[in-house]
Amino acid sequence: MRSRKLTGAVRSSARLKARSCSAARLASAQEVAGSTSAKTACLTSSSHKATDTRTSKKFKCDKGHLVKSELQKLVPKNDSASLPKVTPETPCENEFAEGSALLPGSEAGVSVQQGAASLPLGGCRVVSDSRLAKTRDGLSVPKHSAGSGAEESNSSSTVQKQNEPGLQTEDVQKPPLQMDNSVFLDDDSNQPMPVSRFFGNVELMQDLPPASSSCPSMSRREFRKMHFRAKDDDDDDDDDAEM
């Protein structure tokens, strides 16, 4: 009987231990599930906040673009054309400089410069149109320059025509080259070369008298005798000077 009681007590204690272990496992599993649910809730809330902020920023940007487009539609085209535009200043200045050069007188140039200072940068086309209209009315000087160029061309043509007869007379006065059939031109001939072609008239040279020698011709012996005599005379003079 005692052995049965002992075995029953051991079994009951083992059952209690198994129940307590299962309860502890269930509690730990519930705790893990609660922590994961809290984490997922935090993540979902943060993602919702991020999406809300992004959508709000996009909504604000869209609102700004819509407001700008509405303002541009409300502003008339004339007002938009009158607004100052950022354009390079160099073409305008070049056009005003050309206009002042075309207009006669200093007053026209001063008026054009004043107009350039008063008008905005976008009014370059108006000034260029007015300048073209003034040139059509006859205030510019390109026509005169074209006329002067035509006059200069006419004068140069007349001068050339006047010079042409003089050139023709000079050509007529020059005698043409005459090729004679002389012996000098014949390469195969054995006759002597004509001297008159190089030295002029040879007959005048033959009439001249022969060149006279300055000193008479003497032999070598006579020259030696004279040399020694002169040498002896020099020695005698030296002796007399020493005495």
UniProtKB/Swiss-Prot annotation:
InterPro entries: UPF0688. The modification Phosphoserine is found at residues 148, 189. Residues 78-100, 132-243 are annotated as: Disordered. Residues 233-243 have a biased composition (Acidic residues). GO terms for cellular component: nucleoplasm. Keywords: Nucleus, Phosphoprotein. It is found in: Nucleus. Its main location: nucleus. The keyword Endoplasmic reticulum does not apply. Residues 145-157 have a biased composition (Low complexity). The keyword Phosphoprotein applies. It holds the Pfam family UPF0688. Belongs to the UPF0688 family. This is UPF0688 protein C1orf174. The lineage of its organism: Eukaryota, Metazoa, Chordata, Craniata, Vertebrata.
